[in-house]
Amino acid sequence: MRFTVGIALCLLLGLGGFVYFFIVDGRVPQSTDFNPSIADIRRLANAPAEERPSAIEVEFLAEDQLPFFGLQAGLDFRSATMARSAFRLKSNWGNTLIDVGMDRYVAALFKTGKKFDDTSLARIGSAMVTARRIVVTHEHPDHLGYLPRSKSLDTLIPKLRLTREQIEATAQYMEDGRIPEAFRGVDPVSSKGFTSVAPGVVLIPAPGHTPGSVLFFVQMADGREVLFVGDIVWTMSNIRDETGRSRLVQSVLMQTSEDRPKTYQVLRWLISFMDQNPDVLVVPSHDDSYLRELVASGRLVQGFGQLQP
C-alpha cells in the first residue's frame, strides 16, 4: 500500500513539475543585457515636426480566440482575443506602414486568422501602394506574409526597409517556396544598430521572438512618443505582471521556436523602459482589448483611410 501511495505521489509531483515548468513559469529576469540607448534613439528620431507622423491608424485584419494562458504563462483559462493588426503612420513626408498582415492563402497555410476581414486586407493593399515607407516588426506570417504576395511587389521594393532575416522569410509564404526575384536587389537594413527608416521613426533590432524582430520608436509631430513592440508581448499584462509566454507556447505551439532568454531580456528592458518613461505609448500587435481602448481614447484611429491623406 505504501509503495502504491509513494508511486502516486511521485507521479503527482512529476506532473506538477511538468505543468509548472512548461505552462506556469513565465518569470522575467531581474536584469538584462539588452540596453539600447534611448538618448541615441531620440537623437536619431529628431526630424522637422512637419515631416514626423501626425496620426496613427490601425487595421484589425483578423483575429483568433484562445485561452489566456496561450498569451501569458499561467493557468488562466478565460477566452482571449488575439488581434492580427497593421499600422499606418500618417505624415506630410509620406505614410509609413508598420506590418502588412497576411492574405487568406497565408492565413490558411499557417492555420491562423480564423475571423478574417477581406475589406481590411483591401485597405492594407491600397495603403502599401500609396505608402512612402513599409517596414515590419518581424518575419511571422501575420506581419509580413502579405508583402511578398502583393501584385504590386515590384513597385513596393524601393519603399521597403527590411532586415536580412525578414527578406529570407518571404520564401515560406510563396507557393514555390522561393524568395521572390524582386527581393534579390534589396539592400537589407542592419540588424546591429539603430536605423532611421522615416522622419521620426527609428528601427531598433531586438532579436528573440524571431531572429529578425525589431522595435520601432516614433516621435510624433506634436512631441508624443510611441514604441511599437510587435510580438515582444502579446498582452499588456505581460508587462504589468512581469510574466512572459510559457515554454509550451514558445517551444511547441509557435510556428518557429522562440529564443526564450533573448525574448525575456527584451521584455525586462521594456518593463524598465515603461517604468522610466510612463508618457511613452507602447503599442503591441495582438492585444485586442488594449488596442480598441486606444481607438476609443483617440490615440489610434481605426481603419486606413479614415483620415485625409
Ranges and model annotations:
Residues 43-45, 119-126, 130-142, 152-205, ...:
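Metallo-beta-lactamase
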Residues 145-155, 293-298:
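Metal-dependent catalytic neighborhoods of phosphoester/phosphodiester hydrolases
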Residues 26, 121-122, 224-225, 229-309:
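Cap/insert and terminal regions of metallo-dependent hydrolase folds
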Residues 14-35:
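Membrane-interface motif at the C-terminal end of an N-terminal transmembrane signal
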Residues 100-103, 139, 209-210, 230-232, ...:
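Active-site metal-binding loops of divalent metal-dependent hydrolases
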Residues 1-15:
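N-terminal Sec-pathway targeting helices
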